[in-house]
Design a protein with these regions (language model features):
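Membrane-interface alpha helices of multi-pass inner-membrane proteins
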Residues: 92-97, 129-145, 153-154, 178-183, ...
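Transmembrane-helix motifs of polytopic, lipid-linked glycan transferases
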Residues: 59-79
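Short hydrophobic alpha-helices at membrane interfaces in multi-pass membrane enzymes
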Residues: 122-138, 169-175, 259-269
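Membrane-proximal, lumen/periplasm-facing interface regions of secretory-pathway glyco-
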Residues: 310-364, 375-377, 384, 395-396, ...
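Transmembrane catalytic cores of multi-pass membrane glycosyltransferases
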Residues: 14, 19, 145-258, 287
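Specific aromatic-rich, kink-prone transmembrane helix
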Residues: 71, 93-96, 108-125, 154-158, ...
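Short periplasmic/luminal acceptor-recognition loop of GT-C membrane glycosyltransferases, typified by
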Residues: 359-402, 427-434
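Periplasmic/luminal catalytic loop of GT-C fold multi-pass membrane glycosyltransferases
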Residues: 383, 402-441
Length: 441
């Protein structure tokens, strides 16, 4: 339900030639202040779709997913991770990351996380590369709210954990300061800095949306390949650290922490793991950050690996390709205890409300207010081109938590006053008949 909202926002921006600072879509939040923090991603998505076929969006998702793999390979090589460990980690890393490889702004943000990481590493022997961080941070601030992570990492790498940098201290501080100032180049100014906290600390949405739940409380998540692989990666990190031991001046963890960039990278991976323990949506980030570090932890143990075993490691990427080719990787276990496979297809899923909304707008020529589920709001704004204005959508910063709960209560029939108000305003009603109280509408 997020991609259609981004496409609607991108369409509005391209049509009006500006970034909205008030909500132009909702019937109940219409005209209220709104920080369109992912406006550039929305414009990109809509521009790609406008090339002529929705499958161009799928191609963009494939391209961004592939670039993640390319950047991760560059980072692992910069750490000196042996090919054996790079191959061995392919399957668990990409099974853990796979469920987040969807076309949403966070896919761009994951690429930028790895890009900043690689630039800070490559910038040690080639300091001119560090100046690229400034335009990268301008781009990041307009694509996704996670740009604050980039600011923190750049300051940490250039100003605190600066071992191995050949650029003079003054210039490093200039780049760090320039990277911070670069994020102010956005349509919302300093308001953009508050938005990520408003989004992440909303108690209503974080408790009601699957990806914002802790892994162990999200229904069925702990049996998915993503969760199993994530646990496996974290276990490898812990075991590798234990086998390393604290060590001496030049060995063990003590020696690794003195390597350029390793200490900050380890701190970033631990932080991402903590975030993933709070909200499962961060599992992909944690897995990507741990992959090179696990390779370092195990690759520096100086264990002798026979050539035949090294060749056997090639079986892992081959197995991954075969697994992905067989109708997609397993998405979970069904009620009968069988693996549920993802099916291959294109276009919008029939489980989405595309057909009923298209019928309302293009066949029945309905316009005005649409009383609907929050997950239908983005589709409504996108498909109707603004002709229908939903009473609720997934942009939690447009609505207060109190109104979101009241809207849900009205749909269930537990808030008669608001239900009456909304139905009187509505030109049409689109609800999920399987949810409580909907059939009475």
């Amino acid at each position: 339900n997020d991609l259609p909202m981004h496409l609607a926002v991108g369409h509005w921006i391209l049509e009006n030639g500006q970034v909205p600072n008030v909500d132009p879509f909702s019937a109940t939040g219409h005209g209220g202040p709104w920080v369109a923090h992912e406006w550039l991603a929305a414009t990109l998505f809509k521009s790609v779709e406008s090339l002529g076929h929705p499958n161009f969006l799928i191609a963009l998702a494939v391209l961004l997913s592939a670039s993640l793999g390319g950047l991760l390979e560059l980072i692992q090589r910069s750490f000196g991770v042996p090919a054996f460990w790079r191959l061995l980690l392919l399957v668990p890393v990409w099974l853990a990351v796979g469920r987040r490889l969807m076309l949403r702004p966070h896919l761009l943000a994951l690429n930028l996380v790895l890009l900043v990481w690689w630039i800070t590493r490559h910038g040690r022997p080639s300091p001119r590369w560090l100046w690229v961080l400034i335009p990268v941070m301008t781009l990041w601030a307009n694509l996704h709210g996670s740009f604050l992570l980039g600011i923190a990492y750049i300051i940490g790498d250039l100003c605190i954990f600066s071992q191995g940098h050949t650029l003079p201290r003054k210039q490093r501080f200039m780049i760090a300061g320039g990277s911070v100032l670069a994020t102010l180049v956005n349509p919302h100014g300093v308001a953009l800095y508050l938005f990520p906290f408003q989004l992440a600390l909303d108690p209503v949405f974080t408790a009601g949306v699957f990806e914002w739940l802790p892994p162990w409380t999200a229904p069925g998540f702990m049996t998915t390949p993503a969760a199993i692989s994530g646990i496996g990666l974290f276990s490898l990190a812990l075991l590798g650290s234990a086998l390393q031991g604290w060590g001496s001046e030049n060995s063990g963890l003590r020696g690794l922490l003195k390597r350029p960039g390793f200490a900050l990278s380890l701190l970033a991976a631990v932080t991402a793991t903590f975030l993933a323990s709070r909200q499962l949506r961060h599992l992909a980030l944690a897995s990507l950050l741990w992959a090179p570090l696990i390779g370092v932890l195990w690759g520096t143990l100086n264990w002798r690996i026979s050539p035949s075993l090294q060749k056997a490691a090639l079986a892992f990427p081959v197995a991954l390709v075969l697994l992905l080719g067989f109708q997609g990787y397993p998405a979970g276990i069904d009620a009968q205890g069988q693996w549920r496979w993802r099916s291959i297809g294109s276009g919008w899923s029939p489980q989405t409300p595309v057909i009923p909304i298209d019928t309302l707008v293009n066949q029945w020529e309905v316009s005005g207010v649409l009383l609907c589920e929050y997950e239908f709001g983005g589709f409504t704004s996108y498909i109707s081109g603004g002709k229908l204005r939903p009473t609720m959508d997934s942009r939690n910063t447009v609505y207060t938590p109190e109104f979101f709960l009241a809207h849900e209560a009205a749909l269930r029939g537990e808030n008669e006053e608001l239900r009456k108000t909304l139905t009187e305003k509505a030109s049409a009603i689109l609800v999920h008949p399987g949810k409580p109280g909907r059939r009475s509408l």
